Regions:
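Helix-to-loop junction immediately C-terminal to a conserved catalytic motif
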Residues: 23
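Conserved ABC transporter NBD signature motif
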Residues: 31-46
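H-loop/switch region of ABC-family ATPase nucleotide-binding domains
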Residues: 165-166
């Protein structure tokens, strides 16, 4: 559908676990998972982008190699990539602005470029749903802006994006809907409907203070030396 949903909540709330269950990498303890009306292992194509720290950035592969991995489901494991597959990889890299980086080792990329590479892989995969686990962590403001410019282009590709993050102000300003978690679903819907004092208290508990001014809400975490999430 091209929708963009932010998944927010305190550390340990279950954001990464939720993504792994949706991607079919973990089984739910009970109940079942349905993605666009189908099981994750069904015909729905899901791309999962793990947290930056979970990737071996010194593994000797090029940017093009990683993006081509997105074609594995179409090619199979024992066949060579066709000219069509390589054209799709080229298109995906150009779409995210990495066309001239195809031959570079992944260790040579900046943090923002690494995230754009994974988006290119999802495009090559022809994913219906993209799960991005805290992709803006460690990125400077220009890199974050580049990432969201690329995500804007995915709307025309009809790719739905679920995006785990901690910045509530960014979630409110840059996403169609938000999901607020803390070991359970606290709220889901438009940011202005979910980010209420009551629901933020339910998610973050007594360890935070909630400040309101000019229709903005600031969440101040008393346990993290004044760290602020807006």
């Amino acid at each position: 559908t091209g929708e963009r949903m932010a998944v927010v909540g305190p550390n340990g709330a279950g954001k990464s676990t939720l993504f792994k269950v949706i991607a079919g990498l973990m089984k739910p303890d009970n109940g079942k998972v349905s993605v666009f009306g189908a099981e994750p292992s069904g015909h729905i194509c899901i791309s999962y982008l793990p947290q930056h720290s979970h990737v071996d950035w010194h593994f000797p592969v090029t940017v093009s190699d990683v993006v081509l991995m997105g074609r594995t489901g179409k090619i199979g494991y024992l066949r060579w990539a066709s000219a069509k597959d390589r054209e799709i990889v080229k298109y995906a890299l150009n779409t995210v602005g990495l066309g001239s980086f195809s031959g570079r080792q992944i260790s040579q990329l900046s943090g923002g470029q690494q995230q754009r590479m994974f988006i290119a892989r999802a495009l090559a995969q022809e994913a219906d749903l993209m799960l991005m686990d805290e992709p803006v962590t460690g990125l400077d403001t220009p890199s974050q802006e580049e990432l969201f410019t690329v995500l804007d282009s995915l709307k025309s590709e009809k790719v739905t994006v679920m995006f785990a993050l901690h910045d509530l102000k960014l979630a409110a300003s840059s996403f169609d809907r938000v999901m607020l978690l803390n070991h359970r679903l606290v709220g889901i819907g438009k940011p202005q409907d979910v980010f209420t004092k009551e629901q933020l208290k339910a998610a973050y508990g007594d360890r935070i203070q909630i400040l309101e001014a000019d229709h903005d809400i600031a969440v101040v975490d008393d346990t993290c030396c004044g760290e602020v999430e807006e």
